[in-house]
Amino acid sequence: MFSKILVPVDGSENSFRALEHAIFLSTKIKEAQITVLYIIEDLPSLYIYSPKIMEKLRADYEREYTRILERCKEMANKSGTNINTVLKEGDPASKIIGYSDMERFDLIIMGSRGMGKFKEMIIGSVSNKVIHHAKSSVMLVR
């Protein structure tokens, strides 16, 4: 069955709904372990950025991921569920697929989209890449 569940989150409501589904599923499958994964997208490393600007960007990312992961922990605590949190840096789709494959997750539960439609058309959605390239089963949540 599904004993290892990976839930990538990006702060979108869809990603929090995915976590709600994972928490619900874990109440039905007593041995299920949930890991919440947040990915910091690569910081642009253009030569025009000063070290001060890069530090500010990094601090902004840190505040954001801390806020998001704290919300995930609160959601889990309300239902009496334990979760693990993991932070990675890089391309979201590649990191989700790579981490899932490396840790042998049985199921990835993720939001169907986290960014605007226009941006998805240009670069392709993370969820679409994960569906087509992950070895694990994938459940998309709207």
Where do the model's predicted regions map?
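Conserved beta-strand positions in the Rossmann-like core of class I SAM-dependent methyltransferases
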Residues: T35, N84, M139
